[in-house]
C-alpha cells in the first residue's frame, strides 16, 4: 500500500504520540509499504531518498510558549503540498484532530481517497493545561468540537484503548472504532543491570512522562516524602514539561532529592534497568506507552486508578493500583513493594509476560487490516451505480 501519514509533528520525537507514530511508520515500511509523511519539518531532516510533504510551523499567539512546553507543534497547512500527498496515496491516515487533518479530510473526500483517523489527543490533555482538567462541560465540549471538526467524516477511527473507544461512543462518535494498542517497541524487554554510583544503595522509584498537570507527579513526590523509607528512596522523574520548576520547588520544600531529566532511548533503557519500581500517577491517559515500556522491562507498576485513565487495565492485581490523587495510599504501596522484594521479583516476570500481548508487530498488522478495509469500502462505493 501507498500510505500517507498526516501528523503535525513527526520529525521531532519529543512526545509519546510522535514516538509512537514513528515506530508505526518504521514497521509499516519493514512490511513493504511505501509510507510518506505530511508534517512540519525541513528538508535536512529527511532520510536520503525520502519523499515528504513538509509544512511550516503554525504560531499560536499567546499560547505558543505553552504549546511548545508540552512538546507540541502545530502545522500551517500548505494546501498544494497536502493535496499532492493525498493524490499519491492509496490510503491516508490522520493522526491528530487539528487544522492539518481538517483540511486533509476535505481534500481526501474531494479526491475520493479512502482515509482513517486516530484518536490520540484526550480532551483532558488540553483542559488540564489551563487548570480545567476536571471540568466536565469543558471536556465534553472538546469531544464535541473534535467530532464536528474531524471525526464526523471518519468511517474508521483508531482508538489505542477500550476506555477511549467507550468515551467516543458515549460522546456520539459514529465511525467504526478499531481498538488497537500503540504497541511496545521490541527493544523494551526484561532487563536488569547494576546501578551506577549515583543510585547505588537506593531503592529507585521511576516515573516517565511529560511534566504537566494531568500527569500528577506532585502526588508521587508527596508520596515519597510520606514513605517510611523516604531516606532509602531515590525518585527519578524522566521527562520534560511546564511543571518542572514547580515540581522542583515541591521536592526542595519537602527535603527530597529528586532527579529530573529527559533521556534518549538508550539511556532510558539503562535507567529502567536500574530502577526497582515504576509509578504512574496520571489522572488522564489514553494508554500510557511509558508505563507499558517499563513493565515490558520487568518493572512492577503502581498505577493511579483514575476513571479517565486507560492505564489501570495493565494492573495484574490490587497491589499495582492506588487511589488516584491519594499520596498516602501511594506511599503505602511503595512501602509494600520495598518491603516485599521476593513478591516484587516474582511479579516482574509476570509483567514482562503481559507485555507480549502488546507486541508492536501485531498492532501494526491490525492497523494494516483497518487500512485495507477502508480501501475496499472506498472501491466498492466508487464502483456502485450512482442514482
What are these regions (language model features)?
Residues 245-266:
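Nucleotide-activated donor-binding/catalytic signature segment of Leloir-type glycosyltransferases, i.e.
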Residues 196-225:
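Conserved donor-binding/catalytic core segment of Leloir-type glycosyltransferases
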Residues 97, 283:
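Aromatic "clamp/platform" in nucleotide-sugar-dependent glycosyltransferases that forms part
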Residues 41, 163, 183:
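Carbohydrate-associated surface elements
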Residues 300-305:
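Short hydrophobic beta-strand element within catalytic cores of glycosyltransferases
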Residues 316-327, 336-341:
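Conserved acidic donor-binding segment of nucleotide-sugar-dependent glycosyltransferases
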Residues 184-201:
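Acidic anion/phosphate-binding donor-loop and adjacent secondary structure
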Residues 110, 123, 138-156, 171:
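Membrane-proximal helix-turn-helix segments that form the acceptor-binding/catalytic region
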Amino acid at each position: 500500500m501507498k500510505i500517507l501519514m498526516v501528523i503535525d509533528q513527526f520529525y521531532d520525537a519529543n512526545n509519546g504520540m510522535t514516538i509512537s507514530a514513528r515506530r508505526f511508520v518504521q514497521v509499516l515500511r519493514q512490511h513493504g509499504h511505501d509510507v510518506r509523511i505530511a508534517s512540519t519539518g525541513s528538508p535536512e531532516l529527511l532520510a536520503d531518498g525520502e519523499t515528504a510533504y513538509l509544512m511550516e510551523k503554525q504560531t499560536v499567539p499567546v499560547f505558543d510558549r505553552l504549546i511548545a512546553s508540552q512538546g507540541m507543534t502545530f502545522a500551517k497547512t500548505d494546501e498544494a503540498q497536502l493535496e499532492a500527498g493525498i493524490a499519491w496515496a492509496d490510503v491516508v491516515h490522520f493522526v491528530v484532530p487539528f487544522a492539518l487533518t481538517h483540511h486533509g479530510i476535505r481534500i481526501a473526500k474531494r479526491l475520493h481517497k479512502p482515509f482513517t483517523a486516530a484518536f490520540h489527543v484526550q480532551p483532558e490533555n488540553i483542559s488540564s493545561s489551563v487548570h480545567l482538567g476536571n471540568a466536565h462541560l469543558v471536556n465534553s465540549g472538546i469531544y464535541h468540537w473534535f467530532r464536528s471538526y474531524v471525526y464526523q467524516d471518519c468511517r474508521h477511527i483508531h482508538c489505542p484503548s477500550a476506555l477511549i473507544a467507550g468515551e467516543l461512543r458515549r460522546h456520539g462518535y459514529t465511525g467504526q472504532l478499531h481498538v488497537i494498542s500503540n504497541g511496545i517497541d521490541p527493544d523494551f524487554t526484561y532487563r536488569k543491570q547494576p546501578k551506577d554510583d549515583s543510585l547505588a544503595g537506593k531503592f529507585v522509584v521511576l516515573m516517565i512522562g511529560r511534566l504537566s498537570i494531568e500527569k500528577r507527579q506532585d502526588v508521587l513526590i508527596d508520596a515519597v516524602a510520606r514513605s517510611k523509607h523516604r531516606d532509602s528512596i531515590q525518585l527519578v522523574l524522566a521527562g520534560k514539561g511546564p511543571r518542572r520548576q514547580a515540581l522542583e520547588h515541591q521536592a526542595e520544600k519537602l527535603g527530597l532529592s529528586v532527579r529530573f531529566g529527559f533521556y534518549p532511548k538508550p539511556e532510558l533503557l539503562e535507567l529502567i534497568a536500574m530502577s526497582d519500581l515504576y509509578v504512574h500517577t496520571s489522572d488522564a491517559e489514553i494508554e500510557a506507552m511509558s508505563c507499558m515500556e517499563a513493565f515490558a522491562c520487568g518493572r512492577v507498576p503502581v498505577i493511579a486508578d483514575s476513571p479517565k485513565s486507560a492505564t489501570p487495565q495493565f494492573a495484574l492485581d490490587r497491589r499495582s493500583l492506588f487511589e488516584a490523587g491519594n499520596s498516602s495510599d501511594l506511599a503505602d504501596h511503595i512501602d509494600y513493594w520495598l518491603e516485599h522484594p521476593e513478591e516484587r521479583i516474582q511479579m516482574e516476570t509476570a509483567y514482562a509476560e503481559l507485555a507480549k500481548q502488546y507486541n508492536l508487530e501485531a498492532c501494526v498488522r491490525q492497523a494494516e487490516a483497518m487500512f485495507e478495509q477502508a480501501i475496499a469500502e472506498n472501491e466498492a462505493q466508487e464502483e456502485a451505480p450512482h442514482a
